[in-house]
Amino acid sequence: MTMHDRPAHDRPVHDRPAHPSQARRTVVVGCVMLAMFMAAVEVTIVATALPQIVAKLGGFSLYTWVFAGFLLTQTATILVFGKLADLYGRRPVLIAGIVVFLVGSTLCGFAWSMPALIGFRLLQGLGAGSIQPVAATIIGDLYSPRERPRIQGYLSSVWGFAAIVGPLAGGLIVEA
């Protein structure tokens, strides 16, 4: 049996100490929550701002593809990024996903047409596909099964907070 044939919990993780301190775990959870917030708030900002975006870019017939393209690439890549995190380590895969997500987000802001926006949303979804599975894996690495429900509660609260902040931010962006 090779190293890559063993279950993930039996494999060494390249980018974490054997027994991280509570302070380090807190910092890591904060960073993971921030990454998740970026992906979560993006959806609600776009949902609020998209009618204005479509009015400026045209292409109403492509409206649903702005969301569908993002979700399709995000969903399709979740398993891929989970495996890559097992092979290459959690940190580099999460950071690469965040970078791809941010590049896609920036390019969305400069989109000149609806097809361009959809293409950039595909890129954004690709990056977002790494955030959720790698975040859950990091929590599994850092916390015992007994501690995980509490931390998963913190991570879940990010989605609730994003649901409040996103529409407000989207409205401000549209009105600015």
Residue ranges and their predicted role:
Residues 2-176:
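Transmembrane-helix bundle of Major Facilitator Superfamily
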